[in-house]
Amino acid sequence: MKTGKELKPGTVIRLENDPWLVQKAEFTKSGRNSAIMKTKLKNLLTGYKTEIVYSADDKLDDVILDRKEATLSFISGDTYTFMDTTDYTMYELNAEDIEAVLPFIEEGMEDVCEAIFFEERLVSVELPTTIVRKVAYTEGSARGDTSGKVMKPAKLSNGTELQVADFIEIDDLIEIDTREGGSYKGRAKK
């Protein structure tokens, strides 16, 4: 059993005997009302999508999923093909199935993902907590600001934009925390 406040993208819960994938989860706590979790769910069997609001204390049935290591093999339009690293089986996912990690997926990446299966069917992937990506474009740094606390926008090679420290330059490798939408962690060790 899970509670409403434990929901996060990639979690699968059972509603009316169907498995539902949590694609988006936003925790909100206001002074007057109790804490709530706004979720965007996708039915893994039918593909139907819906949005449901849960209170933080709601009890939900979670689904036991199989997990395997996989790597991105190639991208064809909106279809992403992943390969199981143990038996080399290929699995396909649509872009909408991996919406939460899509900003950090790029052709040729070498990160080992965690493929999530429900009844032998690939339903989602999770990236490692920390990934390394190359900065494709960023503005020059302001003179004298080397403390690392001043942030500026940067664009990765796949088009994703995020805030990085002011001293980061084009072609620098940076570490990104993939949880909660992704954030800059620091310059990658060479």
Curated annotation (Swiss-Prot):
InterPro entries registered for this protein in UniProt:
Elong-fact-P_C, NA-bd_OB-fold, Rib_uL2_dom2, Transl_elong_fac_P/YeiP, Transl_elong_KOW-like, Transl_elong_P/YeiP_cen, Transl_elongation_fac_P, Translation_prot_SH3-like_sf
Task: Please state the protein's primary subcellular location.
Answer: cytoplasm
Which keywords does UniProt give here? Cytoplasm, Elongation factor, Protein biosynthesis
> Which compartments is it annotated to reside in?
Cytoplasm
A Gene Ontology biological process annotation?
Answer: peptide biosynthetic process
Q: Pathway listed for it?
A: Protein biosynthesis; polypeptide chain elongation
Signal peptide: which range, if any?
none
Q: Name one GO cellular component term.
A: cytoplasm
Q: Does the keyword Aminoacyl-tRNA synthetase apply?
A: no
GO MF annotations for this entry? Answer: translation elongation factor activity
Domain of life per record: Bacteria
- Is Cytoplasm tagged as a keyword? yes
For this chain, the family text in UniProt reads:
Belongs to the elongation factor P family.
According to its UniProt entry, the function of this protein is described as: Involved in peptide bond synthesis. Stimulates efficient translation and peptide-bond synthesis on native or reconstituted 70S ribosomes in vitro. Probably functions indirectly by altering the affinity of the ribosome for aminoacyl-tRNA, thus increasing their reactivity as acceptors for peptidyl transferase.
Q: NCBIfam families annotated for this entry?
A: PRK00529.1
Q: What is this protein called?
A: Elongation factor P
Protein's organism: Pseudomonas fluorescens (strain SBW25)
Upper lineage ranks?
Bacteria, Pseudomonadati, Pseudomonadota, Gammaproteobacteria, Pseudomonadales
